[in-house]
Swiss-Prot record:
Biological source species: Mus musculus
Entry protein name: SAP30-binding protein
Gene symbol of the encoding locus: Sap30bp
Subunit structure: Interacts with histone deacetylase complex subunit SAP30.
Gene Ontology biological process terms from the UniProt entry: regulation of DNA-templated transcription; response to virus
Function noted in UniProt: Plays a role in transcriptional repression by promoting histone deacetylase activity, leading to deacetylation of histone H3. May be involved in the regulation of beta-2-microglobulin genes.
Family: Belongs to the HCNGP family.
Feature: compositional bias, Basic and acidic residues: 79-99
């Protein structure tokens, strides 16, 4: 009962700040002023020129978004004031793990039939006319002028940092391998370290080294051929018969090329040695009168080659 009272009270407070559907333009203006005084959902500072500023003027848009988010948080804090809540329910909800809540919800949905699963109803009340006009103008600018919000965000200086992806993951504490499915359906962190490619590469390298070593050992083995016992005599007889037939066939198949090449012998020159005994004294006349003589002693052998 306490939970139902809280929901009804929050809806009643939200209805007070929202515009009634039956009000006209005057009623809308009055309610808009009331929401501005009381800190409504959307402030008038959320103006038309948020995206008309060139270059890096989108920072003002971020500041206005922060102000609007703060105001919405204030409204939520006002609507969430409990009247007389049961402290046991709050403590139990705080103690439970969010993953357990998701798992329990998924189990309930999986056990339901397709007819029982329905889309939740739209929230009661009406959105502020100022916010509707704002969205309508932005949509018209997108259709007519081709304004792209993603391009405006990407053009900012803060998003030109090459390491912005890692910084955002660290700042927002995002789990890249995480999932919204419960663990009983899919658990991305349930794999062991051996399942990742680094450990698989190491194991593969070890197995390849073992195979290479085995191949090297196989090449070192010496194979010895053997013959059966009792077949030695037959083997020798057959070998001699085959050898004799091979010799006979070779003799029958002689051709002109099998004849021996005649070898021509070149006669070596004969050396004749003649021994000549020359006189011991040779007289040489130096003048016509022959009065003076000189003596030359000559003793030896003269070698003479025979003419061919």
């Amino acid at each position: 009962m306490a939970g139902k009272k809280n929901v009804l009270s929050s809806l009643a407070i939200y209805a007070e700040y929202s515009d009634p559907e039956s009000d006209g333009e005057t009623g809308v203006d009055a309610v808009g002023g009331a929401t501005e005084e009381k800190g409504g959902l959307v402030s008038d500072a959320y103006g038309e020129d948020d995206f008309s500023r060139p270059g890096g003027d989108e920072d003002g848009y971020e500041e206005e978004e922060d102000e609007n988010s703060k105001q919405s948080e204030d409204d939520d804090s006002e609507t969430e004031k409990p009247e007389a809540d049961d402290p046991k329910d709050n403590t139990e909800a705080e103690k439970r793990d969010p993953q357990e809540l998701v798992a329990s919800f998924s189990e309930r949905v999986r056990n339901m039939s397709p007819d029982e699963i329905k889309i939740p109803p739209e929230p009661p009340g009406r959105c502020s006319n100022h916010l509707q006009d704002k969205i309508q103008k932005l949509y018209e600018r997108k259709i007519k002028e081709g304004m792209d919000m993603n391009y405006i965000i990407q053009r900012k200086k803060e998003f030109r940092n090459p390491s912005i992806y890692e910084k955002l993951i660290q700042f927002c504490a995002i789990d890249e391998l995480g999932t919204n499915y419960p663990k009983d359906m899919f658990d991305p962190h349930g794999w062991s370290e051996d399942s990742y490619y680094e450990a698989l590469a190491k194991a593969q390298k070890i197995e390849m080294d073992k195979l290479e070593k085995a191949k090297k050992e196989r090449t070192k083995i010496e194979f010895v051929t053997g013959t059966k016992k009792g077949t030695t005599t037959n083997a020798t007889a057959t070998s001699t018969s085959t050898a004799s037939t091979a010799v006979a066939d070779a003799q029958k198949r002689k051709s002109k090329w099998d004849s021996a090449i005649p070898v021509t012998t070149i006669a070596q020159p004969t050396i004749l040695t003649t021994t000549a005994t020359l006189p011991a004294v040779v007289t040489v006349t130096t003048s016509a009168s022959g009065s003076k003589t000189t003596v030359i002693s000559a003793v030896g052998t003269i070698v003479k080659k025979a003419k061919q």
